[in-house]
Amino acid sequence: MGKFMKPGKVVLVLAGRYSGRKAVIVKNIDDGTSDRPYSHALVAGIDRYPRKVTAAMGKKKIAKRSKIKSFVKVYNYNHLMPTRYSVDIPLDKTVVNKDVFRDPALKRKARREAKVKFEERYKTGKNKWFFQKLRF
């Protein structure tokens, strides 16, 4: 069977605090490492989705409703459900990597990077389905 957990693939988080949220694989580790001897992936996802906007709303209200809260986390493959979709959101690999979990300041920076890139993509109007809450 081919490897399908690749960077850019959209996954659904199944377990934990962010379960039911959509995320994108930033880096996948199929063979595991010494500290995590199982296949896992570094993902960046959306914690709080942007709210619905209409034409009648003003600029300020639209700006407020278009905010996104993101998360960066390492997940076991068992806790991720891959979808057939992929998005090409260019996250900076020097900022968003596995080393960010050692230092809270770096983690904040990585989360900020993901937030900025997600909001940028949301404002262009591409990948609309990615920025909508999963209805379940």
From Swiss-Prot:
Residues found modified as N6-acetyllysine: 27, 93
GO MF: RNA binding; structural constituent of ribosome
Subcellular location: Cytoplasm, Cytosol; Cytoplasm; Rough endoplasmic reticulum
Name by which UniProt lists this protein: Large ribosomal subunit protein eL27
GO cellular component: cytoplasm; cytoplasmic side of rough endoplasmic reticulum membrane; cytosol; cytosolic large ribosomal subunit; cytosolic ribosome; extracellular exosome; focal adhesion; membrane
GO aspect biological process, one term: cytoplasmic translation
Keywords noted in UniProt: Acetylation, Cytoplasm, Diamond-Blackfan anemia, Endoplasmic reticulum, Ribonucleoprotein, Ribosomal protein
Keyword Methyltransferase recorded: no
Gene3D superfamilies: 2.30.30.770
